[in-house]
Amino acid sequence: MSFIEEFINKGYFHQCTDLDRLTTITKETKIAAYIGFDCTATSLHIGSLMQIMILRLLQRHGHKPIVIIGGGTSKIGDPTWKDEARKILSKEDIAKNAKGIKKSLSKFIKFGDGKSDAIMFDNVEWLDSLNYLEFLRDFGVHFSINRMLTMDSVKLRLEREQHLSFLEFNYMLLQAYDFYYLSKHYNCSLQLGGSDQWGNIVMGADLIRKISRKEVFGMTTPLLTTSSGAKMGKTAAGAVWLNEDLLSPYDYYQYWRNCEDADVIRFAKLYSELTSEELNEFERLAAEDINAAKKKLAYELTKLCHSEQAAKSALETAVKIFEQGEIDESLPTVVLEQALLQTGISAYELFHDVGLASSKSEARKLIRGKGAKINDKLVEDENIIINTTFLLDKNAIKLSAGKKRHILVRV
């Protein structure tokens, strides 16, 4: 199966500037293709997982993945489908975030000097040195304001009479220049991105054709939601991060283990590397025992992101908690100052402080709704004082929010 055939078969395809021609070229030769990521956090989350799996697919088929860490464009902010302007990041924040993002990507693709090894750049390397007057003279003439105003992402803000600064309006020009720069210096002939980036991608391809007369392509992926319409990558407890310093492998496993029934097969196709035969077997398993299929999905995706050992450990922890009723030492742990527990803290404050509720009011709601447990016993009073008398034999307090989220509190 070719790169494009597998790309479509896995459900990645949404739109392409010339699919037939790109299919032919990728069969005949190896290309360089790029995807860009904004430097807005110290880790990528599963909202970027499709794009990451595409980079991995490119590499597996012998093509060269190029990753752009948008340090330069992060100084401006992409207005695409945003209701308001983004906060502009400092150089220090961008550098810190870029390091974390490379850590996320390195879990899935190999960086190096080989023909199909991935390479990564921060677009600040070329954007910072752009001379504004020369940029306007050499490139500005190729962009139509008329066309830019018709792009849905811009039109939406204008129709709502929301502020769209000139700073943000320049984002699409700079993204187009990124594609031009990579085409010129690294022979990059394909830009990939989410369907919300279509307008920006097409502008870059058009710029290259006008200036360099080179054949390049743009291809987008669908914007994914869960079957209930929730945005991928976000939960009530926060983002589902790929880096273990922000989300433990156990919690990563639990996210996939608890996905909606209707998403299980789709997620296996999108995010795992099960073969066609294995996927057929997985579909049969899902039809017979959906919970067994969810465990299989969670195991495979945790193994891919973290390691096989991490996946085994997460599975064992889940079995001990949910099937054997034990406290497991590998549960996510929060350490509190001993003085705090000696004095005592109300139950609702504790659930908020350890991250099991996004606010104190949410913590109260959790307890009132009979969703909070301490040491596997239902919390009846949100104001009950939790102190050192609640410590178990293993010198820990087990907090549970619902059936799936658990934390050990230690001093």
Curated annotation (Swiss-Prot):
**Its domain of life?**
Bacteria
* Keywords, ordered alphabetically: Aminoacyl-tRNA synthetase, ATP-binding, Cytoplasm, Ligase, Nucleotide-binding, Protein biosynthesis, RNA-binding
Q: Any idea which GO molecular function terms this record carries?
A: ATP binding; RNA binding; tyrosine-tRNA ligase activity
- Give the Enzyme Commission number: 6.1.1.1
Q: Which GO terms describe its cellular component?
A: cytosol
Question: Which residue ranges does the UniProt annotation give for the motif 'KMSKS' region?
Answer: 231-235
Catalytic reactions of this protein: tRNA(Tyr) + L-tyrosine + ATP = L-tyrosyl-tRNA(Tyr) + AMP + diphosphate + H(+)
PROSITE patterns in the record, alphabetically?
S4 (PS50889)
User: Main EC class of this protein?
Assistant: ligase
Compartment(s): Cytoplasm
Motif segment ('HIGH' region): 39-48
Primary localization class, coarse:
cytoplasm
Question: S4 RNA-binding domain: which residues?
Answer: 345-411
Its GO biological process annotations read: tyrosyl-tRNA aminoacylation
Q: Which residues bind ATP?
A: 234
- The record lists L-tyrosine as bound by 34, 171, 175
Q: Name one Pfam family in it.
A: tRNA-synt_1b
Function summary: Catalyzes the attachment of tyrosine to tRNA(Tyr) in a two-step reaction: tyrosine is first activated by ATP to form Tyr-AMP and then transferred to the acceptor end of tRNA(Tyr).
Q: Name the PANTHER family on file.
A: TYROSINE--TRNA LIGASE, MITOCHONDRIAL (PTHR11766:SF0), TYROSYL-TRNA SYNTHETASE (PTHR11766)
Q: Which family does it belong to?
A: Belongs to the class-I aminoacyl-tRNA synthetase family. TyrS type 1 subfamily.
Q: How does it assemble?
A: Homodimer.
Q: What is this protein called?
A: Tyrosine--tRNA ligase
> What species is given as this protein's source?
Rickettsia akari (strain Hartford)
